[in-house]
Amino acid sequence: MSVLPYPLWTRLRRTWRFEKQYRRWQRARGHELGSRDRLPHLVAEYARGKSFVDAGGMWGVDGENAFAAARAGASRAAVLDIMAPTERFEERRRETPIDYVRGDITDPSVAQHVGVVDVVLCAGVLYHHPSPYEVLVGLRRICGETLILRTETIPEMDLPGAAVYLPHLPPADQRRWLGMAGVASQIAVGGAFRPEVTYANWFWLMTPSCVQGLLETAGFLVERHLEEAFSATFVATVVGPAMVHTPDAAEITVTDRHFAPLI
């Protein structure tokens, strides 16, 4: 957080010269800094000798992180995504065997096809889902040891745990957050929400503290937080089950009394 007004602070964080100096200051204070380029190195560090899956690892990267895990010596490497495998991915896995599972991480049946793996990576997914906690619950179902989560974020503000839900905001507010978030015009960010494109929409702008709270609720303990201006990478270990409420028979019976029969 900063003593500067939030719009000014976010504007400064988008300035290359200021951000370079600020990251130098962060490093001197012992903060661990992240970047998109560090992700394959984290994968190699944690996947060596382990089973690995990249959840949402097809769009824009053609399964590259799964191949990085295989190169690092993962015992098994796989990609899980809702989109079909790309031609580039299919070409590369002729030489390097990589499993592919097509499905939605929030679908409980996906865990039956993926199984429980040691290391799970999920990058660039969380803010594209209307229910990010359900994404983390799905990741917890398949994660046996370590989760590497990278997501777009906004800088911390005076209200820890804050987040902004983007769809259906008034246009002026959308433009305001677009300016402060440091992102180019995206669907539902500076533009109208389009339900027909589903997960291509940007649903959330979350602070890192919000993401960490969600992780802990889902049964993870954050061990490392690699900081960036408008992104965050978390390395978290499994410490317990995710909070999931399943109504028992008594609850269902009591609830049903409040509703008239459907005709």
Task: State each model region's role.
Residues 1-23:
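N-terminal, positively charged/glycine-rich alpha-helical extensions of SAM-dependent methyltransferases
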Residues 60-108:
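Class I SAM-dependent methyltransferase SAM/SAH-binding core
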Residues 110-120:
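A short acidic, Gly/Pro-enriched loop at the edge of an enzyme's catalytic core
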Residues 118-132:
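A short SAM/SAH-binding and catalytic strip from SAM-dependent methyltransferases
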Residues 130-262:
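S-adenosyl-L-methionine-dependent methyltransferase catalytic module, highlighting the catalytic core
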